[in-house]
């Protein structure tokens, strides 16, 4: 789903969206936020524009919908909703979680609603993000216990993805992970978030191979 495209329009922390959250939860429908949706990412012009727009105006706004859901009480009210930020990398996630919690604690005088858990806990229980290549993020995944929240993708057919060299991309950044950690990041986490039936998928694969 799209984020708000400028400050004049209500974002997902507004209670007017509660009927939508109710339907999403009742349908057990996971939701995703893709980079470059919502605000126009083509904000910088001239020298360096391609890099500036990608880093500053495509990736960073992905924090906003996550903060909206985790800090506003949406996930507290709708605890079965699962959400994922897509194609935005993972290295920024530990910082964002710490930043949300720090703001909630230190701005407690005007932070509302008062939540029974810290904002980061709602991401850990209900959220995920995807990446193509992010070695820094993978190091932090282990250190900050976020292996269950990260999902690898090859972003086919886009040029910033890893296809057709996905195997090499996986090996050069996941060599320090255990087999269990790799399995989660390479598929099991996605199966959980998107309600895939692993056994059914494996059966279809085996049938196709045979």
Language-model features: where?
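Hydrophobic faces of well-ordered beta-strands that scaffold small-molecule active sites
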Residues: 1-2, 31-33, 83-85, 127-131, ...
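Active-site gating/metal-coordination segments in enzymes
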Residues: 1-65, 72
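Active-site-proximal loop/turn and secondary-structure-junction residues that shape catalytic pockets
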Residues: 6, 37-39, 89-90, 133-135
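Distinct, well-ordered alpha-helical segments
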Residues: 13, 43-45, 97-99, 138-143
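Glycine-enriched alpha-helix->loop->beta-strand junction motifs that scaffold or abut catalytic
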Residues: 25-30, 48-51, 78-81, 123-128, ...
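Aromatic-lined glycan-binding groove of carbohydrate-active enzymes
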Residues: 31, 35-37, 71-120, 124
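Aromatic-anchored helix/helix-loop segment that forms the rim or "lid"
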Residues: 57-65, 108-139
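Mid-to-C-terminal alpha-helical segments outside catalytic/metal-binding sites
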Residues: 72-73, 81, 91-92, 128, ...
